Amino acid sequence: MATSRYEPVAEIGVGAYGTVYKARDPHSGHFVALKSVRVPNGGGAGGGLPISTVREVALLRRLEAFEHPNVVRLMDVCATARTDRETKVTLVFEHVDQDLRTYLDKAPPPGLPVETIKDLMRQFLRGLDFLHANCIVHRDLKPENILVTSGGTVKLADFGLARIYSYQMALTPVVVTLWYRAPEVLLQSTYATPVDMWSVGCIFAEMFRRKPLFCGNSEADQLGKIFDLIGLPPEDDWPRDVSLPRGAFSPRGPRPVQSVVPELEESGAQLLLEMLTFNPHKRISAFRALQHSYLHKAEGDAE
């Protein structure tokens, strides 16, 4: 497929992943989002795309067969230009007009109703559970890559493309936010699917607050802001061989969740704390979070 088949409509934005365009498919009349990223060529005599990139795209194309409603569709992939050193790859996604950041900003005061937040969270977690069940760690969840359709359907975007995006991000002078990063990522420790659940907790709180929960300006500052809420973790939970020792942080105890998200009732506060658990092995999974009582009872029901 050639991207010339699509008619560009507008530039949506320039981010860490490159430039994104809204385009129209004249055959179907549907709008799509085009993301062009540069990928370094693989080794060997033939050059071309590295096998890791080919595998990554192949996995995402296989996911298409499931047509999960809470995951953005990757409709096509094509290599559009090539030099000796790199190949320009264009990813064709379904187009969704707004992200969660825009959706939250558009909500009139005092913000989204609690039942709307619960509905968004259920959809968010279903999409994430689907990715995790297919061994995909998102690694960069934030309001800007959670899309919300005009009908209120949540769709996760920019997942499963870590290797494709890493080269482009190194070329792009965009500061990648630390605000949604899990402690194990900030400490440069090993990580897996629980990193996404930390991000979910930050976003869950932000749906109520209408502003980010932890706004650090460096890894150490971000960790300090996290510990101001959850307390300094015990030595047993601190990962070994990491960039910052536990002793670099002053001792402090946890604060009540309601001190930063006063709108949360007790079971919601409990769910948030299970997401914002320092030790990733003790952090709640997307699957278990979906079973949590908070997401299944109407506001005002007895605890």
From Swiss-Prot:
Keywords: Acetylation, ATP-binding, Cell cycle, Cell division, Cytoplasm, Kinase, Membrane, Nucleotide-binding, Nucleus, Phosphoprotein, Proto-oncogene, Serine/threonine-protein kinase, Transferase
EC identifiers of the protein: 2.7.11.22
GO biological process, one term: cellular response to interleukin-4
Modified positions (Phosphothreonine) in chain numbering: T172
Record note on quaternary structure: Component of the D-CDK4 complex, composed of CDK4 and some D-type G1 cyclin (CCND1, CCND2 or CCND3). Interacts directly in the complex with CCND1, CCND2 or CCND3. Interacts with SEI1 and ZNF655. Forms a ternary complex, cyclin D-CDK4-CDKN1B, involved in modulating CDK4 enzymatic activity. Interacts directly with CDKN1B (phosphorylated on 'Tyr-88' and 'Tyr-89'); the interaction allows assembly of the cyclin D-CDK4 complex, Thr-172 phosphorylation, nuclear translocation and enhances the cyclin D-CDK4 complex activity.
Protein purpose: Ser/Thr-kinase component of cyclin D-CDK4 (DC) complexes that phosphorylate and inhibit members of the retinoblastoma (RB) protein family including RB1 and regulate the cell-cycle during G(1)/S transition. Phosphorylation of RB1 allows dissociation of the transcription factor E2F from the RB/E2F complexes and the subsequent transcription of E2F target genes which are responsible for the progression through the G(1) phase. Hypophosphorylates RB1 in early G(1) phase. Cyclin D-CDK4 complexes are major integrators of various mitogenenic and antimitogenic signals.
Name of the protein in its database record: Cyclin-dependent kinase 4
Organism: Ovis aries
